UniProtKB/Swiss-Prot annotation:
Residues 1-16 form the signal peptide. This is Flagellar protein FlhE. The gene is flhE. GO terms for cellular component: bacterial-type flagellum. The keyword Signal applies. It comes from Escherichia coli (strain K12). Keywords: Bacterial flagellum biogenesis, Signal. The keyword Signal applies. Not essential for flagellar formation and function. One of its GO terms (biological process) is bacterial-type flagellum organization.
C-alpha cells in the first residue's frame, strides 16, 4: 500500500520541484505459448519532453494467475530492465532521452501451450525527467 501511495504522489512532488513528467498506458497482451515473447504497444509522451529520464514508475495488471517463470522487462530503445513485481520504480533509464518510448516485454520460458494463457489487462508507466 505504501509503495502504491508513493508511486501516485511522487509525480506531484517532482512537478512541484520544476521537473517534468509524463504518463502513458495501453491495453495488455495475451500470450498463449511458452518460449515466445510479446511486446506491448510503445508507451510515449503525447507532449514534447526535453531532458533526460530520472525515475520511471511502472504498473501492470494481469487477468488470472501468474504463470510460473513469468519474465517481464521494461525496455527503451537501448536498455531493458527486468521488473520484479507488478509495480515499482527504477532509475535504470537515467540519462535516456525523456521522449524515448518504453515497452513492456512479456515472456514465459519453456515450450508448449500456456493453460490458462497469460492475459495482461493494462500496462502503465510514469516517466520523470529533468
Amino acid at each position: 500500500m505504501r509503495t502504491l501511495l508513493a508511486i501516485l504522489l511522487f509525480p506531484l512532488l517532482v512537478q512541484a520541484a520544476g521537473e517534468g513528467m509524463w504518463q502513458a498506458s495501453s491495453v495488455g497482451i495475451t500470450l498463449n505459448h511458452r518460449g515466445e515473447s510479446m511486446s506491448s504497444a510503445p508507451l510515449s509522451t503525447r507532449q514534447p519532453a526535453s531532458g533526460l529520464m530520472t525515475l520511471v514508475a511502472w504498473r501492470y495488471q494481469l487477468i488470472g494467475p501468474t504463470p510460473s517463470g513469468l519474465r517481464v522487462r521494461l525496455c527503451s530503445q537501448s536498455r531493458c530492465v527486468e521488473l520484479e513485481g507488478q509495480s515499482g520504480t527504477t532509475v535504470a533509464f537515467s540519462g535516456i532521452a525523456a521522449a524515448e518510448p518504453l515497452r513492456f516485454i512479456w515472456e514465459v520460458p519453456g515450450g508448449g501451450r500456456l493453460i490458462p494463457p497469460l492475459k495482461v489487462q493494462r500496462n502503465e508507466v510514469i516517466v520523470n525527467y529533468r
